[in-house]
């Protein structure tokens, strides 16, 4: 369903490494699957285990401002991120539904001034994810991370400490267990009107609008990032 240049759907990719590897890079990346990743689906209201991240016996970091502590070492992301946020290492993160960064998936004003049709400005929020962070989507839900137009994801892992998105159950061998990662942008789309003042392409996965006329638009960086076990179908031809 990859027909939109204005966005990337990075889902249903079983342990695929995105970016940061040159053609002759022979670096090996090993990821040990915990016995219970996030603990969100097995521990009732208590959230199960203390999160999928291995803190090596050290006291885990506290949950960043704007997140909610589910259990020790596990922080739930909010439904909306409208300003810059950093997901620090030392704890893991849980998504129980859609997490939307920015508001650029709304319809744009038809006069082409770059504002939304309700008169509000497009937010420019940046979600930074530190190396080694694990982000879990609640198993059996459409939990997903949506980066909207005007906002960015800066996910810069390393070979020794990749950033991993997966469901919150044990292991990494499933598929279609949660939604995935959706990235919108202002890049040109083949359905945008030639010479138009604005472009709104209704995107799949019920993720709102994307598209524009900026061929140099950037929605951030993905380096040593793994997206595993994702994929959610809303209806035929409409999926993450």
Regions found by a protein language model. Give the residues of each.
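Bacterial N-terminal signal peptides that target proteins for export
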Residues: 1-10
């Amino acid at each position: 369903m990859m027909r939109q240049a204005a966005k990337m759907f990075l889902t249903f990719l079983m342990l695929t490494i995105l970016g940061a590897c040159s053609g002759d890079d022979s670096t090996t990346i090993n990821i040990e699957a915990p016995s219970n990743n996030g603990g969100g689906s097995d521990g009732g209201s208590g959230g199960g285990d203390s999160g999928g991240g291995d803190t090596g016996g050290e006291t885990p970091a506290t949950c960043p401002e704007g997140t909610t502590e589910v259990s020790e070492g596990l922080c739930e992301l909010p439904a909306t991120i409208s300003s810059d946020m950093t997901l620090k290492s030392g704890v893991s993160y849980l998504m129980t539904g859609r997490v939307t960064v920015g508001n650029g998936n709304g319809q744009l004003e038809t006069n082409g001034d770059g504002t939304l049709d309700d008169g509000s400005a497009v937010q420019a929020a940046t979600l930074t994810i530190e190396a080694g962070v694990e982000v879990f989507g609640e198993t059996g839900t459409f939990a997903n991370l949506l980066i909207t137009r005007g906002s960015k994801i800066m996910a810069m892992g390393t070979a020794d400490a990749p950033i991993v998105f997966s469901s919150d159950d044990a292991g990494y061998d499933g598929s279609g267990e949660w939604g995935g990662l959706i990235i919108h942008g202002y890049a040109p789309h083949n359905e945008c009107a030639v010479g138009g003042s604005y472009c709104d392409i209704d995107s799949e996965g019920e993720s709102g609008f994307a598209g524009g006329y900026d061929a140099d638009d950037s929605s951030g960086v993905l380096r040593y990032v793994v997206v595993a076990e994702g994929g959610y179908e809303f209806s035929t031809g409409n999926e993450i």
